[in-house]
Curated annotation (Swiss-Prot):
Belongs to the FAM228 family. This is Protein FAM228A. Transmembrane segments: none annotated.
Length: 206
């Protein structure tokens, strides 16, 4: 077997066969380097894919939504135990609505007032207790309050006027006192001047 392989190899690479081979195409150095890089990258990717273990991650599930699904499933199983039939979520909601409507009290409203007369009387008593004052009394109390406010306003106005007058009088008194002091000073000076002139008149003849 090995002999046959070597024989075929020698036959393939004989000088006559090598002459029959086509001439190699001229390839640029950059193209050769790019092909080598691509080959290395492909080998690295294949090696990584073979060495890495692929793990399937389950999709994200909202915990609240999951809890709601569990509750719905429990309700469905409970209804199945009661009726002996498997129901969908929509059928379960319709059955629960019908049960709720049946359990709620039913009120019949007529054209007349539904509230009994005793309730009207009780509410009237409560209103009479809470509102002890009649409208006339309320108006009178309002007028009285306004009068009090007016009186207080008048008193404050009178007090202000008194204070203003007293301050004005005190200012006048101060001005009068100043004038009196000035006039006294002038009188004394005039009297002294007269005396000196009289003495001069008397002394001149001597």
């Amino acid at each position: 077997m090995a002999a046959t392989k070597t024989a075929s190899y020698d036959e393939h690479f004989r000088p006559e066969k090598l002459r029959e081979w086509p001439e190699p195409e001229s390839v640029s150095l950059m193209e050769v380097l790019a092909r080598e890089d691509i080959d290395e990258a492909v080998c690295a990717i294949l090696f990584k894919e073979n060495s890495i273990v692929k793990v399937t991650v389950p999709p994200f599930v909202d915990p609240l939504f999951q809890r709601q699904q569990e509750v719905d499933e429990e309700r469905r199983t409970g209804l199945q135990c009661e009726t002996g039939k498997r129901h969908s979520i929509k059928e379960l909601e319709e059955i629960e609505k019908a049960r709720l409507h049946a359990s709620s009290p039913y009120f019949t409203f007529t054209s007349h007032c539904v509230i009994p007369k005793e309730w009207h009387k009780a509410s009237a008593r409560a209103r009479s207790k809470t509102y002890k004052y009649s409208p006339e009394k309320l108006i009178y109390a309002d007028k009285k309050q306004k009068r009090k406010e007016k009186k207080t306003a008048d008193l404050s106005q009178a007090a202000f006027e008194r204070q203003f007058l007293s301050s004005k009088l005190s200012q006048k008194n101060k001005v009068g006192e100043r004038k009196g002091l000035v006039s006294r000073g002038l009188g004394r000076g005039w009297h002294a001047g007269l005396c000196s002139t009289h003495e001069q008149h008397i002394l001149v003849p001597e």
